[in-house]
Amino acid sequence: MVKIGFDPAKNATNRASRGLPFELVEQLDWAHALMEEDTRKAYGERRFQVLGFIGGRLHALVFTPREGKVHVISLRKANSREVKRYAETPKSRTD
C-alpha cells in the first residue's frame, strides 16, 4: 500500500467542493495508472500528474513525493479529455 500525506485543510476543501477526500488515493490502481512528471513550471519540488482508477472511475491526481510518501496536492474525477488520453495511451499492463 502506498503511504500518503496531505494538508488537512486542503483535504477538507477538496472533500467539500468535489466530494473526494484525499484518503481515497490509498485505493488508486497504481499498476495501471498513467503517470507523467509536470514540468510546466518550477514548483520547487517534483510534481506528478496521474490518471488512474479508484473503484470503477478514472481520477486525476496531482502529487509530489515528500518524506517517502505520496503528498496529495489535488484529486478529482478525470474529465472527458483525460479519459480519452488514458484510453489512447499504451500502458504496460500485467494482466
Enumerate the language-model features and the residues they cover.
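Ribonuclease/tRNase effector modules and their secretory precursors
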Residues: M1-D95
